[in-house]
Curated annotation (Swiss-Prot):
One of its GO terms (cellular component) is nucleus. Residues 98-142 are annotated as: Leucine-zipper. It holds the Pfam family Homeodomain. Disulfide bonds: none annotated. Expressed in leaf blades and panicles. The gene is HOX20. Belongs to the HD-ZIP homeobox family. Class I subfamily. Probable transcription factor. Residues 170-180 have a biased composition (Polar residues). Keywords: DNA-binding, Homeobox, Nucleus, Transcription, Transcription regulation. Residues 40-99 bind DNA. This is Homeobox-leucine zipper protein HOX20.
Length: 269
């Protein structure tokens, strides 16, 4: 006698196996209903360990159950095709559940790793922000100190300019000293070298010697000319008429020009 579950219509599922319209209890799916006993109770026969192992090996090979494969397994294992179909259906559901658990565990592990990286990056970010803030504070302090020092330096020269000179020297002394230094600097480069000065002195001395010799020569000529004229006058007075007349009427020799009126050629002799 068949169980009520065996009388339910069956439909093929998407995986190629056989499914029922209503959900059945696992024990009822795994059991085979027998005839009624003396106690009036319904006996159930469960699958043996060998049958379960054979079905597991077949499921690991292919989790989809084809009609020909279902009939062959039922014939080889001494089961009804309905029992084979129900076992594959339940086994596939458990496999999907375990697959979801494995996927969840993998995703959870990835999530934990990403969360740890995220926390580490957040800590690094906070540390960098704190360092940037500290550096900005130091930079601001340095800028403030630099501006303060610059203002102080600008104020110090102004105060020193406003104070009178402490030495008591005239205010124009610095300008005169600077101008004197500039004048000395302008004059010193134009001084002749010692060799040039010696040459100039030697040339001036030579010119002086030549000029002195020329003056002596002209003086001597002028002196001799005057002596000759005095001798002629003396002879005229002493009675030398001829000499006197001759000397008186004779063409008077022009005296030589003084040394300062003579031609310039004699200066070079």
């Amino acid at each position: 006698m068949r169980s009520p579950a065996a009388l339910l219509p069956v439909v093929a599922d998407g995986g190629g196996g056989v499914g029922v319209e209503e959900e059945m209890d696992v024990d009822e799916d795994m059991a085979m209903c027998g005839g009624r006993g003396g106690g009036g109770g319904e006996k159930k026969r469960r699958l043996s360990v060998e049958q379960v192992r054979a079905l597991e090996r077949s499921f690991e090979t292919e989790n989809k159950l084809e009609p020909e494969r279902k009939a062959r397994l039922a014939r080889d294992l001494g089961l009804q095709p309905r029992q084979v179909a129900v076992w594959f259906q339940n086994r596939r559901a458990r496999w999907k559940t375990k697959q979801l658990e494995r996927d969840y565990a993998a995703l959870r592990q990835s999530y934990d790793a990403l969360r740890a990286d995220h926390d580490a990056l957040r800590r690094d970010k906070d540390a960098l922000l704190a360092e940037i803030k500290e550096l900005k504070g130091k930079l601001g302090d340095e800028d403030a100190a630099a501006s303060f020092s610059s203002v102080k330096e600008e104020e110090d020269p102004a105060a020193s300019d406003a104070d009178p000179p402490a030495t008591g020297a005239p205010q124009g002394s610095s300008e005169s000293d600077s101008s004197a230094v500039l004048n000395d600097a302008e004059i010193l480069p134009h001084k002749p070298a010692p060799a040039a000065a010696a040459d100039a002195a030697a040339s001036e001395e030579t010119e002086a010697v030549v000029t002195g010799a020329a003056l002596l020569h002209h003086a001597e000529v002028f002196f001799h000319g005057q002596l000759l004229k005095v001798d002629d006058d003396e002879a005229a007075f002493l009675g030398d008429d001829g000499a006197a007349c001759g000397g008186f009427f004779a063409d008077e020799h022009l005296p030589s020009l003084p040394w300062w009126a003579e031609p310039t050629e004699q200066w070079t002799t």
